[in-house]
Amino acid sequence: MKNFDYITNPAKLLTPEIVQMVGSIHEHKGKQELFLEANIDELKTLLEVALIQSTGASNRIEGIFTSDKRLEELVSQKAEPRNRSEQEIAGYREVLATIHESYEYITPRPNIILQLHRDLYSYSQGNIGGTYKNSDNVIAETDAEGHQKARFIPVPAFQTAEAIDELCVRFLEAWEANLIDKLILIPMFILDFLCIHPFNDGNGRMSRLLTLLLFYKAGYIVGKYVSMEMLIEKTKETYYEALQASSVGWYEGENSYEPFVKYYLGIMLKAYNEFESRVEHLKHHNLSKPDRIKVVIDNKVGKITKKEIMELCPDISKVTVERTLTDLVKSGYIAKVGAGPSTGYVRI
């Protein structure tokens, strides 16, 4: 059985780079409360948008898709799921909402993990959720020629319950002891969870839900307002590279958690930077929406895309953004560059 060492292993991760990243996140967390107190009304918009973005992104990473319109309707509970993909999207929304509302009272123990997995599949047919895998699984990768090969072989099905029990016991011991920064401890737990791969399906989505839960419990609630799942989706290749690098030698206890920990610290830093930027833009609510879009463009060095503008101004509709960009191009305020998905705009 794998030994989950959350006492000596974390000490190996205190490299100058990781220590600097952790220190920067602590600084952002210190500002977090000030932002939350000063911008209560504006933050409601960010929360609603992040809920939609997180639900969509985490499912898309696993190849589960629906249209933007249907996604918004499902997350807003204005529609019932029509197919299997939408059932899984609706289930993710349910678990994410539970974590947002009750994270203080949710402790990552085996029975809780099983209940969250059950709820993840609460809209799905059959008894998919709430039980550990009943057959061994393999994490595969496809090479350039289209051939699949095993990248990692997780814990066998018959050892899964014991592995999750031990994982949770050791993690909670380290959490309560508080000898290591939780920013380092949390990604270590998530990596071990993914290496166990306890379910037949839904392991990736469960890992991201547990990540949010644990960061919230540690006081880092930026994921409520900026979708960390979307940031992961945008850097999916780097995510899988870090996961693979940190899983080598996992069974023997010889793996390095450093690549995966650094990846997640980078995601957290990016989330806080975006959070502060979006709050800053929301402060311009006294301006008209076209003028707010101009402020966003003025503050951007180089090219900016329509999608980036909409992410920074989540309360402004797509139609308004498109109309404003068209008007600004016509007036000579900005120039349109590129075509298709790479279309952007630059200040003249």
What does each model-found stretch correspond to?
Residues 1-348:
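FIC/Doc superfamily catalytic core
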